[in-house]
Regions:
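Short, catalytically relevant binding-site loops at active-site mouths
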Residues: 109-110, 126-130, 145-148
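Bilobed periplasmic-binding protein/Venus flytrap-like ligand-binding cleft at the lobe interface
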Residues: 47-55, 152-170
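Periplasmic-binding protein-like
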Residues: 91-96, 102-103, 134-158
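Loop/turn elements at helix/coil->beta-strand transitions in domains of secreted/extracellular proteins
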Residues: 57-61, 116-119, 136-138, 164-167
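Extracytoplasmic ligand-binding site segments that recognize negatively charged/polar headgroups
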Residues: 1-117
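A bilobed periplasmic-binding-protein/Venus flytrap-type ligand-binding module shared by bacterial periplasmic
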Residues: 32-37, 77, 150-162
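A ligand-binding cleft/hinge motif common to bilobed small-molecule-binding domains
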Residues: 119-137
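Active-site-proximal beta-strand/loop segments in catalytic clefts of secreted hydrolases
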Residues: 35, 64-66, 124-126, 143-144
């Protein structure tokens, strides 16, 4: 438990009230699409979350399980808050019908989309996501209707060997 003197400059909504972690960055969510896979199947890239609910994308979507992945849980939660429970679950139920595979972690969808195993991945959008566009026939897409996000936290482990150095870093 450590609260940096610099933490005061960070909005309270992006840090733990008890000082266990501080938000280092915001990680937005979106889609990574394999252009070749979608073209081969005559599909256009989705532009919105609601597009993913269209049955034409059946078995083309991979995402991490929100029961396992904190990032995917944050994506689910953010969209539900924006849409409201009733509309949100209606849309996610339809998206679920189109998801072929729920990965164990948030790092799995990107490589599988790049490999052409799936046309669409739902994932955290990092600098690395956009770098994939240079190596693979993929496009990273920020959805037009909303961009859910999660804070990327920084913290010091309780049993860290060099807490003084960690405090300087944090």
């Amino acid at each position: 438990q450590y609260e940096s003197p610099e933490a005061e400059a960070i909005d309270a909504g992006y840090r733990d009230k008890d000082g266990y972690w501080t938000g280092l960055a915001l990680v937005p969510a979106g889609f990574l699409v394999n252009n070749d896979v979608l073209e081969e199947k005559g599909l256009e890239a989705p532009k919105t979350w609601e597009d993913l609910a269209d049955p034409k994308y059946k078995d083309e979507i991979i995402m991490a399980s929100p029961a396992i992945s904190g990032t995917q849980y944050a994506i689910l939660n953010g969209t539900l808050q924006a849409w409201g429970e009733e509309k949100g679950w209606e849309i996610w139920t339809a998206i679920n019908d189109n998801v072929d595979f729920y990965a164990k972690g948030g790092g799995e969808p990107g490589p599988k989309v790049c490999a052409g195993e799936y046309g669409i991945g739902i994932l955290a959008m990092t600098g690395g996501t956009f770098a994939l566009e240079k190596e693979y026939p993929v496009t990273a897409i920020y959805p037009e209707d909303m961009i859910p996000w999660t804070p990327a936290p920084i913290a010091i482990f309780k049993n860290s060997e060099n807490k003084d150095a960690a405090k300087v870093f944090v």
